[in-house]
Structures are given as structure tokens and as C-alpha cells.
């Protein structure tokens, strides 16, 4: 079973980040993706006046699965949107452009991955660029 859950304990966040090969940053919010109770990935993100930012988005070092990563990315964006922040950026190192675009991001004129979350979760299919 696929689960995407917030990481509420900073010690757990630090341990899970290590398993995904990313630096733990205490000031960041985080989600974890699990399949049948096994960690598949971690997303660390933040929100500010300029929008939400996915800072780290990494799968476990011993494997990659598209679906848990996709759902985790959408969950982080939904949380950002529910907090009243309606612009998001994907600033995490990630070489999987297909995944980044599937989550909903596209490059802006500066080459940065960005998306407008306004009404995105009311009708996500309406926003598809495919």
C-alpha cells in the first residue's frame, strides 16, 4: 500500500534524509513516501512570501519508483496550497524532468521550475499540459 505522510519528528526526518542521501535541514517541513511500510523517498520543503519551495526531493539510494515520488510531490504541493500559498517552485536537485513535469511544474522564463497552485487541486486534470 502506498502512503505519503508528514514527518513530524526531526530525528526521524534526519534518519530518513540520510537513507535518501540528502542533507537534513531542521527548518524544513518534510513528507515521506512508503510502499508496504518501506521508505521510497523524502521531500523537504518550505514556504515564504515568494511561494512554496521544494528544496529536496530524493528517493532511497537503493531504488526508485515513479508513483510514490509523484504522489509525494503532489502531497507537498497540496499542503502548500492549503496553507494559502498559491505559487510553488521546484528547486531540488533532480535529473528526472519527466517526474517534475508530471507533478505539475514547468520552466518559467528564467529556467526555474514553477507552478501556479490557484485552483489546481480543484481540477488538476484541467491544468495538464499534455
Locations of regions flagged by a protein language model:
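Short amphipathic alpha-helix that is part of the acyltransferase structural core
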Residues: 1-25, 124-130
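Short glycine-aromatic motifs
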Residues: 2, 28, 104-106
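Conserved acyl-donor/pantetheine-binding loop and adjacent beta-alpha core of acyl/acetyltransferases
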Residues: 19-24, 44, 56, 118
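Conserved donor-binding loop and adjoining core beta-sheet/short helix segment
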Residues: 29-67
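Conserved acetyl-CoA-binding loop-helix of GNAT-fold acetyltransferases
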Residues: 64-81
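Conserved GNAT acetyl-CoA-binding A-motif
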Residues: 80-93
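Conserved active-site alpha-helix within GNAT-family acetyltransferase domains
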Residues: 93-111
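C-terminal "cap" of GNAT-fold acetyltransferases
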Residues: 109-130
Amino acid at each position: 500500500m502506498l502512503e505519503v505522510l508528514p514527518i513530524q519528528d526531526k530525528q526521524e526526518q534526519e534518519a530518513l534524509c540520510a537513507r535518501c542521501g540528502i542533507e537534513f535541514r531542521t527548518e524544513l517541513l518534510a513528507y515521506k513516501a512508503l510502499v508496504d511500510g518501506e521508505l521510497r523517498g523524502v521531500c523537504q520543503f518550505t514556504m515564504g512570501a515568494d511561494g512554496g519551495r521544494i528544496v529536496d526531493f530524493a528517493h532511497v539510494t537503493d531504488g526508485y519508483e515513479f508513483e510514490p515520488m509523484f504522489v509525494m510531490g503532489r502531497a507537498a504541493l497540496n499542503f502548500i496550497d492549503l496553507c494559502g500559498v498559491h505559487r510553488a517552485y521546484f528547486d531540488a536537485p533532480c535529473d528526472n524532468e519527466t517526474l517534475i513535469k508530471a507533478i505539475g511544474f514547468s520552466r518559467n522564463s528564467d529556467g526555474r521550475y514553477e507552478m501556479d497552485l490557484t485552483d489546481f487541486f480543484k481540477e488538476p486534470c484541467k491544468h495538464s499540459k499534455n
